[in-house]
Amino acid sequence: MTTTFLRCAATLVAGAALSLPVLAQKPADATAKEASVKVDANLPAYAPTAGVSGSIKSVGSDTMNNTMTLWAEGFAKHYPNVKVEIEGKGSATAPAALIGGTSSFGPMSRPMKESEIDEFEKKFGYKPTGIAAGIDMLAVYVHKDNPIQSLTLQQVDAIFSKTRKGGADKEIVTWGDLGLTGEWANRPISLYGRNSASGTYGYFKEHALFKGDFKDSVKEQPGSSAVVQGVAGDVAGIGYSGIGYKTADVRAVPLAKDGKSKVIDATPENAYTGEYPLARQLLIYVNHKPGSAIDPLRREFLRYMMSKEGQLDVLKDGYYPLPSRMAKKQLEKVGL
């Protein structure tokens, strides 16, 4: 779990940013992504307003810890009397916190399940509002020295799943099973992943494992960065994590939906078009009664998120910013 407290006074914000371990682990090549992807020039610059104070608490996805922290730091520059607390326990914790009234925002790296929505609606009489905050690609990573050229989702399923709902005839346990030769032929595949509280785990289970079950041999890691670190230190390793966590020590393997489909690289263009099989929206859920006015504190935080500055924070964290038309639609969901 990661918990971050930011009181929006300059000295304390600076201290919080310097001491935040997740930010320190973020790969340096996010800067390279900034050079190839630009924030939409049509996004509005954030304009602060008077009368904003109080406390914000975010509970949910650890994948979005860095982004939430960057937003909090940017927000801090405008509102010195606002306190922000960020807890990254996994996407599964977001719905319960919103239902229990213990959080302002519920960041999730997957959509809420029907059961979670139903539980929320049972208490409040309306559904939670999901707001897209950025675009991510869930990459399948191998060690940088691994010669594998591409994988189909059926192969990914046969590597990670014991149920093989993707239709593979047999499980894949060595790199030779994927056609690699020489020293790789008999090398066992070493699996890295997340635990069941993670939205990344849930998304991968649904979309790459065809809702099947993970093998018991998957080494469950405490965070997205840890998965990449595990693969980076294991020449036979393979794991899944957000594209924002890519480092120079791993490769994101190009993927195809099936054996008849085009192999798609993990590039920004393929994320925006939706061609990449594991592209996903990063979501922020809020408790907002339709037709009502959202409170000033959450209103302004959401406006900051969807501003030019807020989407630059998304880009800095290694994800892809929203086009202005999409950002505008997100604010309309809460009457803004």
Label for each model-derived stretch:
Residues 20-24:
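Sec/Tat signal peptide C-region and signal peptidase I cleavage site
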